[in-house]
Amino acid sequence: MSEETSAQSEEWETHAGWWQEFFTDGADPEYEEQILPLADVHLAGFGRVLDVGCGEGQLARRVAALGAEVVGVDGSWAQIDAARRRGGGPTYLRGSATALPVASASCDAVMACLVLEHVEPFEPAIDEIVRVLARDGCFVLFLNHPLLQAPGSGWVDDHILGEQYWRLGPYLPDDASMEEVAPGVRLPFMHRPLGRYINVMAERGLLVEHMDEPPPSPGFVARAPEYGEAVAIPRLMVLRTRKVE
C-alpha cells in the first residue's frame, strides 16, 4: 500500500465497528432497499466476482447467493475478520484497491460499493480493476452521488422563503476532506465530478453501458422526514461498465 492509501485504511480499521453496527445486517435502509437489490440486477449471472473494499461482506454474500464464486478484498483486518465470521460463501483477502491480490484476467465481474470516493488517488485502483477483469468483463461502481460530495453542498430548509432545496457547492474541482459522519467518526472523502470517473475508466477500456440514479429510498425518507422534499434528488449513483480492450 502507498503511505496515503495505508492511512486511509487505518481510518476504516478504527471505525469498522461503527460501520458494522449502523450499515449492515439490515440496519441501513439504503442498503436494504437500494444497494443490495441493485447488486442483484447488475451482478446476476457472473461466475467469478471480485468485491473491492468488501467491508464485512454483505454485498459479497448477496452476490454469492446468486451463484457466483466471490472473492472480497479489504484493507481492514477488522472488516475481513467480521466477514469471515459471518461466512456466506465468499473468500476474503486483506489487500489494497491499488494492489489487488488477484490474478490478471481472472474475474468475470468486479464491484466496488461506496469505496472509490474514499481512495486517493483512484486511478491506480481503476488500473487494477482493469487488470483483473477478463475481456468483456463487467465493472459495477456504486458511488455516493457526486452532487452530494461537492464541498459545501447540503440540504437547506429555508424557513424565510418557505422552500427546501439542495445547495450545490463547487462541483468541478476535485476536493479531498475529512468529514465527521457521526460523533467521533471522521473519514476521508474525495469529491470528483462524474466526468472524472467516466473518462478515467474510458481511457482504460471500461465503457459505461448502464447508469442508475434512484431517488432516496422510502426507509431513508421515513427516518429523515425533514428531507421530504428531496425525493427528486438522488443520493446514489450506479455505473455498470464493460471492458472492451
Predicted features, each with a name:
Residues 50-52, 56-99:
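Class I SAM-dependent methyltransferase SAM/SAH-binding core
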Residues 98-109:
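A short acidic, Gly/Pro-enriched loop at the edge of an enzyme's catalytic core
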